[in-house]
C-alpha cells in the first residue's frame, strides 16, 4: 500500500501536486476563517447578527465583481502568474483582517480579498486539468477535495487553539499559510497553459473579449443550466457552515473552540472517506449521486430543526460531508469536460462564480432567516434542497447528451469523463 502511494506521488506531475498544496493552504485559511468569523464579528467587533451575512457577502461580492473581468485571465497571461498573484493577494487580505477595526474597513478588506480569490480556485483546477488526462480528472478532483479538507482540519483545530487567546488571531494563521503557498508556487511551478492543447485549440486573435468571452455560460446553454442548479443546491448547503456556529453558540451547546473542533471533524471525514466513497459510487449515475446528496442534506436539516444538541450537530455535519463527497468531484469534472482546452480557465471561472454566489447568498440568506427564527433555515432548506438536487441531476444528465455543436465540440469528452461516475 505504502509503495503504491509512493509510486503514485513520484509519477504525478509536479504542477498537479503543487495544485494540491495550494488547495491545502486555501482550505486551512477557509477553515480558520469561516467558523470563527461570525463569533469574532458578534463578540469582539460588536457587529449585529443580521449584518454578519453582509460581511460574508463582501468577500463573495469581491469575487463576483472581479470574475467577469479577470475570471479567464489565466487563458491569456498564463496560469503561473495568476496563481502567484492570487495566492499572495488572498493571504495578504487575511493578514490585514488581523489589524483592521470597524465594519467599513473590514468590508473593504474582504471585498479586495475576494477579488484576488476569484481566480485562485478555478486556476488551480485548470492547472490540474492541464497536466492530467481526462480519464484521471475525477480522481484528481477528489484528491483536491481531500487536500482542501486536510487544510480544513488543521485550520479549525489551529483556530480553536488561537481562539483561546483571541478570535482575531485566526486571521493571522490563515493569511500566513496562503502567503507561504504563494512563495512555494513562485519557485516551484512551471507554466502549464500550453500542455495538452492542439494547434487548432488556440483562441482566434479577433475573438471578442469581455464578459461574453470570459463567462461562457452566456454562450453554452448546458453550462448555464448546470450552474443554476449548482447555485441553488450549494446556497442551502452553505447554511450548515454559516448558521451552525450561531445556532450552537446561542443554544449553549458549543464554545468557539468547540465550533472549530466540529468543523475539523467534518473535514476529517472528507479526508478519510472521500476516495473510498468515490470508488464505491463510481458505477452510479449522476442523477443517483445528486439525489443521494440531497437526501443526506435534507436529513441533516431535519436533525438540526429537531434540536441543537451535540449528537444532532455531529450527525448533521456528518451527513453534509457525505453529501459533498457525492457531488463535489462530479461538478468540476462535468464543467471541465464541457470546456474547450483554450477556454478551460474561463469555464472553470464560470463554475467558480456559481460557488461565489453560494458564498454570498448562503450566509446572507441563512443568517437573515436565523434572525427571524433559529430553526427557520433548516425548515426552509428541506424543500429547497429537494428541488435543487433533482434539477442538478437532470442538468448533468442533459449535459451528457449531445444537443447542439459547441465550440471545439466538447461533448464526447464530457461523456467519457462523467462516465467515471456511472
Regions found by a protein language model. Give the residues of each.
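Core transmembrane helices of Major Facilitator Superfamily
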Residues: 30, 112-124, 320-331
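Short amphipathic helix-loop junctions that connect adjacent transmembrane helices
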Residues: 36-50, 242-258
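Helix-to-loop junctions at the C-terminal end of transmembrane segments
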Residues: 66-78, 273-286, 370
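Structural signature of the two symmetry-related core transmembrane helices
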Residues: 81-95, 288-302
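Cytoplasmic helix-loop-helix junction between adjacent transmembrane helices
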Residues: 110-150
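A late C-terminal transmembrane helix in Major Facilitator Superfamily
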Residues: 343-371
